[in-house]
Amino acid sequence: MKNYYSNGKLLLTGEYLVLDGAKSLAIPTKFGQDLVVENIQEPQIIWGSFTHTGACWFEAVFDLQKLRLVNCTFNSDREGNGEVIAETLLDILEEAKKMNPSFLKSENGFMVKTNLTFPRNWGLGTSSTLINSIAAWAKVDAFKLLWNSFKGSGYDIACAQNDTPVFYQIENKKPVVAPVKFNPSFKENLFFVHLNQKQDSKEGIAKFREHLDCARHDIQQKIKRISEISDAFLKVESLEKFEALIVEHEQIISSIIKLKPVKEKLFPDYFGAIKSLGAWGGDFVLVTGNADTPTYFKNKGFTTILRYQEMVL
């Protein structure tokens, strides 16, 4: 039996612009997903994916020699159907095999189980943790596997592989990962609130590209400023200055993607600062506040609220 574990992810700075070289601050979470592989006699891959509660949400059987789907079961009303997920999984396995032809080269088969430690709709990296663990199993580069089978910046792979916050940047089409120390003195005033509106990363990237074409004239200046804000996140000593950085960051991204910042859109009467994390419009937001913060958001109908220490690895 082999066990592979990958951390979940949150992108604190540089959403969208990380794709064009901005230095971004990413943090691994205490939540993640493991992948357990056992050898079996049948020449098949028997796959089972389990939620954080232990419920099986996806099952599939693949013919090992031909790498073809035999059958699948999808026990969820979210995000597509079983065959789509099975084909996506098959694409990842096939790409890993192209990268390492000895992967899955066996007369015997495999029983594979994946186990999430967070709800699937949290957006902490159900796909990225899977890709990173498959890459470890196949002994291939996880960033290349991501880029060959999906799209995305790769910051989530950096989080999957590191147990500390990282600066993540794409330079000359290659990932540059630098572990950093991000331990703000005001972390007691930081919260993560889930908006319960799962965002599609591919769709978010596509929309960003559309808007980017219209904003090319000053995009390099904005990338430079976002990189500076990422640096400033590590050095800022007061909550007030941190909030000012959040507001500026939100304004810069808003000017590019032509969407209202989340505070302006949903919480204009909130007393603290709010920052979108990743694709705007869903999943978690970073919130500054105090002891009254959980009550405010619960009264608005947002009940999944985690303190900084509960989320960050």
PLM features: residue spans?
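C-terminal nucleotide
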Residues: 3-7, 11, 18, 26-27, ...
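Short glycine/proline-enriched turns and hinge-like loops at secondary-structure junctions
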Residues: 29, 124-126, 162
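DPxDG-like acidic metal-binding loop motif
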Residues: 121-143
